[in-house]
Amino acid sequence: MNTYKKLLFVYILLIIGVSSIPGQAMPKSWFSWGWEDKIYHMIEYSVLGILAYLSYCDHVRYSFSLLVVSGFSFGLFDELYQSLIPGRFPNAFDVIADGIGVTLGSISTHYLRKVFND
């Protein structure tokens, strides 16, 4: 198992771990616009997209499409899982932000690798 796959596995466990924190135990921001958590979701899932791309996209045919679909699916799973945690609620916009994050992370990694490998 390569280093990126190990990091991906640990990062997935980290996402699940954070999703397991009950809502009342989550830290509150000093100020809130009401949408900044979508930015956090995009950043969180961009890292997931980067690690998934580095782990699998050189080895699997149609891997980019599979990566994006898997990222959206994991985001959906994560939101459904959160519905089982006290004080946490699923949100369709979080799933969309997760999917955008995975897509942006993997696309940016693809192009950065092309630029720096050529």
Q: Where are the regions that the model predicts?
A:
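Membrane-interface helix-boundary motifs at transmembrane edges
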Residues: 1-3, 56-62, 115-118
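Interfacial helix-loop-helix junctions of multi-pass membrane proteins
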Residues: 28-34, 77-100
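"…centered on the first transmembrane helix and the immediately adjacent amphipathic helix/loop
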Residues: 1-54, 67
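Helix-loop junctions at the membrane-solvent interface of multi-pass transporters
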Residues: 18-21, 56, 84-85, 107, ...
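Small-polar-interrupted transmembrane alpha-helices in polytopic inner-membrane proteins
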Residues: 10-19, 66-83, 99
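Membrane-interfacial alpha-helical segments at the cytosolic side of multi-pass membrane proteins
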Residues: 44-59, 101-113
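Post-HEXXH active-site segment of zinc metalloproteases
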Residues: 52-72
